[in-house]
Amino acid sequence: MIYVSSTNRQLTEKYVDWAVHGLPNSKKLQPQEIIKTKDCTKAVMFGVLRGTHLVYRWAEKNKIDFYYMDRPYWGETRNAPYYVKVVKNNHLKNWYEERPSDRFEKSFPWPIKPWKKDGRNIVVCPPSNAMQEFFGVHDWLDNTLRTLKANTDRPILVKNKGYNPIIGKDINGGYIVTGKDNTPPSPPIDWDDAYAIVTYNSNISLEATTRGIPCFTDIHNACAPISETDFSKIETPKYTEREPLYYSMAYGQFTADELKNGYAWSILDGR
């Protein structure tokens, strides 16, 4: 049986309903109900809040195939055509698979600039509070700054998110928003003066690489295949071919129609 987890949030429940529509014999349940089932063969969830992360970890632990949905790598997500990334058995698509360029050419919004090698500032983009909880990386920023300072004399700028809710847990252990982080947001990135972006799993890596700014990321990042994951190598960035990875990423996000007509699931299952 395929179980699809409710998000209990009006803005995101439509993605769940589209998944149910596109997956024959699937059923929508509350997260706490899914993890009690005995006949689950596949699970689907959107995001990690309001109990959905419990389904993710439960499926992972029990070796049940799961499909994780979230905001896309690029494209309109809150209006038609409603792009959403969908990843089988992972949080994001952090690997490369050979794909044609058709979906990329149809939807990619940015020009791809040549690699830029004359920047000055290192811009550090920490994981959100939700991602710190989900991946257990509360000390990521401290560890990252320590490594960078030991290996470079370049200026290091830490970019704070404009929206970064404080995360707690409900009585079932699901992540919930418990407050607001009042840290003021940082100014926009000065791309002309940027030497490199250092981040955990943020999608800023995609924009940066299209602008020709090299990235240093954790393995839990969609641009990890074209980024350096060893932060001690901050003075030797990777300048590698980008387009094939973007083609691959384009086959990891889908429209509402593609969720509903089954195309997304057939691609993810290799059919």
Where are these predicted regions, by residue range?
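Generic beta-sheet signal
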Residues: 46, 68-70, 159, 200, ...
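Donor nucleotide-activated moiety binding/catalytic core segment of transferases
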Residues: 30-37, 51, 149, 154-215
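N-terminal pre-catalytic "stem/leader" segment of glycosyltransferase-like enzymes
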Residues: 1-42, 53, 130-131, 266-271
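Conserved catalytic-core segment of nucleotide-activated headgroup transferases in glycan assembly
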Residues: 117-170
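Structural motif
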Residues: 4-10, 41-42, 44-50, 70-71, 121, 125-128, 195-196, ...
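Extended catalytic core of nucleotide-activated donor transferases of GT-like folds
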Residues: 14, 27-79
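Leloir-type glycosyltransferase catalytic cores
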Residues: 78-119, 225-271
